[in-house]
């Protein structure tokens, strides 16, 4: 299992971890309603299992902007946000990007919910 899962109630806001351009907004068999945002420098963030999506391919988004709501679409056993980071198309340890340079955006704000361990993490892009 790649990425991080953030348990949250259906309808909980999902916000962009950093500014960028929406490069994918589609339904995927495993990920359900999925969004991918290109942040430049070959860095993509992926948000999966959304119940509602508020952006489309080509949209510019800002850090902290509401892009979707938590859901349980696709291959999912309960409402949560599945968050991934890809560099040059290769999945990375998403945890490393939650504390890498820049200003803090608490991961709780990305999912607006508790982290899997119940501890708050920071997204620093």
Ranges and model annotations:
Residues 1-125:
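Catalytic cores of peptidoglycan-degrading enzymes
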């Amino acid at each position: 299992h790649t990425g991080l899962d953030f348990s949250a109630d259906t309808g909980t806001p999902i916000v962009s971890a950093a500014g960028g351009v929406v490069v994918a907004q589609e339904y995927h068999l495993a990920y359900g309603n999925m969004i991918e945002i290109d942040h430049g420098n070959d860095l993509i963030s992926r948000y999966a299992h959304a119940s509602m999506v508020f952006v489309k391919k080509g949209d510019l988004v800002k850090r902290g902007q509401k892009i979707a709501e938590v859901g349980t679409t696709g291959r999912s056993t309960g409402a949560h946000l599945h968050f991934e980071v890809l560099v040059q198309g290769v999945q990375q340890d998403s945890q490393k990007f939650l504390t890498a340079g820049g200003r803090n955006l608490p991961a709780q704000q990305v999912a607006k919910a508790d982290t899997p361990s119940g501890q708050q993490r920071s997204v620093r892009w």
